[in-house]
Amino acid sequence: MTSNAAVTSVLASIWIAKQFPRDLAEVTTRMNQACSRLTLAQSATYAFPRGGTTVEGPSIRLAEALIGAWGNAEAGWKEVARHWDPKGADGKGCMVSECVAFCFDKETNVRREISFTVNHTRDKNEYEGGRKVMKRVALESERDVYELCANMASRRIRACILQVLPGWLTEEALEVVGRTLESGDKRSLPDMIRSMEAKFREYGVTRAQLEKNLGHGLEETTKPEIIRLGKVFNSIAEGLVRVKDVFPRDEQSQTKEPDIPSVSPASPSVPSPIVEDGIPGLDVPEDVPSFGSFEH
């Protein structure tokens, strides 16, 4: 698309948004409908320990649902440039993508952007002198590059969305999500406990580790504890936190801690990002996103 065509497309979408402004009553209704679905509620929040406290907040999945309910808005990311970094990949050199995550409310003309760079590298374990050494190697596949950039963009998109959306909408959504988690699951408590144990087992978490985290036998688990562990599971499944950070093994255990699986075998691992304080949604590591950009 040429620059003139792109400008025309943006102006047209803004004009349409002005002609059909959002109805806050409809926004609230759509938000309630989305957050009342158990599948969304179960993935709507994350929680993980950090510095002796628990970090908790809305996930990218909830942010997607809310910007959809808000309407007349667009959010996503784009790559704007690439350049060569001779110092990347442990001094061997690599390409670097310059990207922008954004959220644009076309009706109010409010736009938030976050620029970031992504080195085209991945971690690779190598053995030197009988010791395992972590090294950075350059990516060659365009698919790997795209997935890495999308991964790095995810929490920045969430941050942009949360800055554009009014705070009351996010707060009400979290309240609805909480009620859905409390009353939306009609299974018996023993069935919920067995399901929870099976899910954690996929990531190498044993029954003993769950019981140590809970402080009592698994059969004594309560509904609020299942909800809390569900948020922890979301954090582990999305790569926000490592299994061993939440469920440490005994020092005498000889069992190797399994790595958190990535989205696909070809997906590169992503380095832990630097915490960026002061911007909502930027206090957690990367999510695995499901989109490049979307409009509502």
Task: Name the predicted role of every residue range.
Residues 1-97, 102-259:
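Polyanion-binding surfaces on beta-sheet-dominated domains and ring/shell assemblies
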Residues 115, 246, 266, 290-293:
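Intrinsic disorder/low-structure terminal segments
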Residues 247-279:
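Long, low-complexity intrinsically disordered segments
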Residues 271-296:
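Long, low-complexity, intrinsically disordered segments
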